[in-house]
Design a protein with these regions (language model features):
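Extracytoplasmic copper-binding redox domains, predominantly the cupredoxin/blue-copper superfamily
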Residues: 18-257
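Sec-dependent bacterial lipoprotein signal peptides
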Residues: 1-16
Length: 257
C-alpha cells in the first residue's frame, strides 16, 4: 500500500509504512555482501541520498530445507533462510529498490550500459536478491551450482521467459525491453529461490545496501517523485526538489508490525 506523498525542498524527511509480521526468521545482511549497483547519471547533477530503516519487530524469514540438495547445503555453515527481510545494524533495511518514478525531463534519453549485470545462482539462491537494470541492458544469468536450475521471469509488461541451466558454469543473457517495477525471477526446481529486478528507462535508481544506505546521482535540477519498493513492506513515494548540484537527504523508515 502506498503512503502519503511528502514534498521536500531542503534538508531531511522521514517516511513511515506499516506491515504485518509473521513467525519466520530475520535474515541479517552478510558481512561484505555485494548488492547490484545502479548506473550513475551525470557527475555534474544533484544527488538524493539516504538510509532506510524499520521500526518495531521485523518479520522473521522462513528456514530453507536444502536436505535434498547436498551440493547447495554444503555451502552453508549455518542453516540458510529466505531473504525477505535483510536487517543490518541499527535496524537498517537492505534490498529496497529506490527509483525516480516521475520528474525526469521529457524527451531525455539514456544509453544503457554495455556492462552486463550478473545474476548468479549459488547455494541454491539468487545473488543479488534485488537489483536494477536499464531497458536494453544485458542481465547475465549464471549457474554456479552443480545442480539443475531454471530461471522463470514473471513479468506483466515484459515478455516472460523460462530457461534451464542444468550444469555449473552455464551463462544465459537476457534483456528487458519495457520499464517495469518489479519483475519476479523464480526457480521452478527450488521454490524458495526468488530475485526481483527493477527495469528502468534511466539510470536514476539504487538498491539499499546492508547498512540501509542508497544514493541516486546525476539528477538535473527539478522536482522528482521517488518511490521505494520492498517485497514485504510495500511502497512509499515522496517528492524531492533538486537545485544545481546539491545533495538532498531522504531517510525512509518502514514500520514492521
Amino acid at each position: 500500500m502506498k503512503g502519503r506523498i511528502f514534498s521536500v525542498v531542503g534538508g531531511m524527511f522521514l517516511l513511515t509504512v506499516c506491515s504485518k509480521g509473521d513467525n519466520s526468521q530475520v535474515q541479517a545482511a552478510p558481512p561484505g555482501a555485494e548488492l547490484a549497483s545502479a548506473p550513475t547519471g551525470s557527475a555534474a547533477g544533484g544527488t538524493i541520498t539516504g538510509k532506510i530503516k524499520f521500526t518495531g519487530t521485523a518479520p522473521r524469514n522462513s528456514a530453507i530445507d536444502m536436505s535434498e540438495e547436498a551440493v547447495c547445503k554444503a555451502k552453508y555453515s549455518t542453516p540458510p533462510t529466505e531473504e525477505v527481510v535483510v536487517a543490518g545494524p541499527a535496524n537498517a533495511l537492505a534490498n529496497v529498490f529506490v527509483y525516480v518514478s516521475a520528474g525526469v525531463p521529457a524527451g531525455q534519453t539514456f544509453t544503457a550500459p554495455a556492462t552486463p549485470v550478473v545474476l548468479d545462482q549459488s547455494g541454491c539462491r539468487y545473488h543479488p536478491h534485488v537489483f536494477g537494470v536499464m531497458v536494453g541492458q544485458t542481465v547475465e544469468i549464471r549457474n554456479s551450482d552443480a545442480v539443475l536450475h531454471n530461471i522463470k521471469a514473471v513479468a506483466k509488461k515484459n515478455r516472460p521467459f523460462n530457461v534451464s541451466q542444468p550444469s555449473a558454469g552455464m551463462k544465459t543473457p537476457r534483456t528487458f525491453t519495457t520499464p517495469e517495477v518489479m519483475v519476479n525471477l523464480q526457480c521452478n526446481v527450488h521454490g524458495w529461490m526468488h530475485s526481483f529486478v527493477g527495469v528502468r528507462p534511466d539510470p536514476f535508481f539504487a538498491v539499499s545496501g546492508p547498512d540501509g544506505s542508497f544514493s541516486i546521482t546525476g539528477l538535473p535540477p527539478g522536482t522528482y517523485t521517488i518511490e521505494a519498493w520492498h517485497e514485504k513492506f510495500g511502497t512509499q513515494t515522496a517528492t524531492v526538489t533538486i537545485a544545481g548540484t546539491e545533495t538532498k537527504t531522504a531517510n525512509l523508515t518502514f514500520a514492521a508490525r
